Every structure is written in C-alpha cells, then in structure tokens.
Amino acid sequence: MSDPLSNPTINTTNVGGQTTTQNTIGGVGGGKSNSVGTPYTTPLQTSAYTTANSLSATNSPIPNHHMINSNSSNNLSGMVTPGGAGLQQQQSSITSSTNNLGLLGQQQPQQQQQQTLLQPFTTQSRLISASCFEFFYIEMIDCIMKSSSDKQQAHKKLDKLGFKVGHRLVERLSLDTALFPELLDAVKFICKVFWTTVFKKTIDGLKTNHKGGVFVLTDSKFQWLQHLSFDSSASNKDCSEYVQFTAGLIKGAMSNFGFKCIVTFDIQQVSTCVFTIKIES
Amino acid sequence: MSKKYDKLGNDVFNKVEKINSELFTLTYGALVTQLIKDYEDIEQVNIKLEQMGYNIGIRLIEEFLAKSGIGRCSDFIETAEVIAKVGFKMFLGVNAHVGDWDANRKEFHLTIEDNPLIDFVELPDQYKHKLYYSNILCGVMRGALEMVQMKVKCTFVKCTLSDDSTSEIKVVLEEVLSDMIPVGYD
C-alpha cells in the first residue's frame, strides 16, 4: 500500500537535486562534503537513492545492524521500554561511534558518547550548539515576516519552508527504521524520534479519535517559545509565526511517510502548543 | 596561545546544549532557496544573508561572552585566534584556522575545514562564484565584532561549493570604535 506512494517521492527528490540550489541527499552531494564522518556517512547516503523497499532494516549497509528481523512495532517498543532490543541498538550505536573515533582523534570520545546518549535511536550525526540554531531561527522568522506583503503570505511561506525541511530531515532520521505498516506507527515516530531530534524531548501527549484519522500532539514546553518575553504594550501579541514552521515540519515528515495531512496548531498558554494532524484520504 | 584556545573551545563545546546539525543545514538550505526565489539578483541574496548574519551576530556575542568566559582581547591577533578556536568550535563544532596575515596585522584569512552549512548542498554552475552560500557567517562575524568595538569587513574569497578546496573568509580590521558618552551625561 505505501510503496506506490513512497517511490514517486524519492524520485522527485532526485530530480529536484539536479535543477536548482537546494539540499540534496545522495552520494554526489556527499562527495562534495568535507565532513569528517564521510567514510561512515556515504553508504547511508547512497542507500537513499534506492527504492523504498531497500530502506528497510534488512538491506541496511551497516554491518553491525541488529534489527534484521525487527519490525517497526519492536522498534517502537524498544523506545518505550529499554529492553534487549533497545540495549542492542545502543551497542550498535556505540560500535559505530568507535569506528568514527579513529578519524576524530582522542579529544572526541566524550563528545561521541554524549552524541550516542542524546540520540540513542537515530543515525549518528554531527552536532552544533543549540543556541546557534535558535538565533538563526529567530532571524529567519523575522526575515520572512518582513519580506512578505501580509501575515497570511508569511505563514504560507513558513509552512512551505517547514514542509521542505521536515520532508528531508525525516528521510535522514528514518534510514535505520523499517517501513511503518500503520499510520499510528508513523505518528509515534514523529512524537519520539523526530521531536527528540528537533526539540530534545518527546511530545508530552498524543491523543487520537477512535477512527484514527485525527491526532492531537501536545507539547507542554515548546522549545522555540521558551525564550520569548512578554511585552504588554506590544501591538502584536500573537507569536504564531514561531510555531507555523513546526506545523510545516510535521506535514513534510508525514508526507515522506506517504500520508498527506493538514496540520493546525493552537498556542494555549505560555509555551504550551497543541498540534492537530488530520489525515487527508 | 593557539593550544590554550583550542582546549577552551573543546571545553565550551562539550558544555553547551547541542542539537542535530542536519536540522540547521536543511533549514538554512531551505531559506537560501527561498531567498533566491524572492530576489531576482544573486547579489541581493548575498547582501540579505550578510544582513541576517549581522543581526544574529549582535545577539550571538552576548551568548559567546557569557558561556566562554573570555575577557577583552589584547590585540587583533588574539581576537582572530579566539574567533577561530573558540567561537567557531563553540557554535558550529568545527575547526577554523587563521593564516595569511598582512604586514600591518590588520588583515587575515580564516579557513573553515568542515562547514556544516554546506553538507548535502550542490550549486548549479550559474551560481558558482556568484552566490556566497555561507555569507551569513560573514555577517555574524561583523555583527559580533562590532559589539566589541571592532569594525571589520568580511568577505568570502574561497568556497568549496565553487570547486575550491577550502572555504576561506578574508577579515579586514577597518577601525577600532571608541566609546561614546551616553546622551545627556556629558
């Protein structure tokens, strides 16, 4: 069922990468990168060019992979309860870190260990200062708000940007994950792995209606609103533009999993955000 | 001096809160793409990126001074080492090198080995040597240094996206700003 939906997406990504300036996931792009981790990263990048079926754990190029017979249910279960599967995955991550250490030298072991602990269930990747990204994010929002003729257009732009980023980011994050057989598994991935990567915490609440087409995600301390201060004299008390990008992230991620959806959000009180995902079908 | 700041850079980077660099790379890439669509002229995109970087830099310097514990630098040479070994390491997790000083010690080249902004990025031929993809870094440096009373001019002279082997930023110290007495206090 999901295969016909997934293949066109991947093809589109490949075609787009050849016609304009944009981020391209693939071996060619990796070849240009000066990343120290290239010898480790390149095989994973190459696998992104294969069909959706090949993205399953069975075909993963990582030699120490322990998920050959796992399905996504076991994977998600391992996240909830740190049992054998979770521990094995951590072992795999640590082994991968060890492979990298030879290239990075002695100063890095502590950093690598932190990296493993911060994201035990995702592909190893570089880290930057969180404040660096947040400064950039604030300036990006400001730039787009100023360059748009009205607020609605700005929100559309932010949503589109978020869609692009979410679509690509989730492709990187799910390299080691088997295909999701059910919609709920995809949403759980967003709540756990995706949210941890972007906000360093899991979503605080997940609700769904009994038909399963609507999901409500609650984040009680939304990271990107934490540092905003309140000015009672300001004419604009609405900070929804800081959240619109995140709605786009979710929409893009779900799109890459083959589910087209509408994402709306509500800022309830200081820093509490509720995202509603409605699946289109 | 270089080793001392190398160690400090590593210590500070280990302490700060960190995030996946791919989110940063992809978000920046999406923004640059949007700017190219919005502005017809590539030169305008470069200017816009630099302006955005300036606005980030004037805020970033507060974070830098608070977290790193560095005091006032004695001269521009020390400033350059601090930027390369502590600043770039702390915020981007990369090593940068200072070289090519001129005779007056007012100009140097900063070489960035492993710029996280350009992971996954390819430039079509018509943009090579025209679009300075990482120009936001020039703006950040200018903004940050202006807040510590150094007026500088930063330009990219080499970029790996334009088929050069490394990324290099030329930094020229134009003047040291003097303190102004606040209005109404003189």
UniProtKB/Swiss-Prot annotation, chain B:
The keyword Endoplasmic reticulum applies. GO terms for biological process: endoplasmic reticulum to Golgi vesicle-mediated transport; intra-Golgi vesicle-mediated transport. Keywords: Endoplasmic reticulum, ER-Golgi transport, Golgi apparatus, Transport. It comes from the Eukaryota. The keyword Transport applies. Pfam families: TRAPP (PF04051). InterPro entries: Bet3, NO_sig/Golgi_transp_ligand-bd, TRAPP_component. It is found in: Golgi apparatus, cis-Golgi network; Endoplasmic reticulum. GO terms for cellular component: cis-Golgi network membrane; cytosol; endoplasmic reticulum; TRAPP complex. Homodimer. Part of the multisubunit TRAPP (transport protein particle) complex. May play a role in vesicular transport from endoplasmic reticulum to Golgi. Belongs to the TRAPP small subunits family. BET3 subfamily. This is Trafficking protein particle complex subunit 3. It comes from Dictyostelium discoideum (Social amoeba).
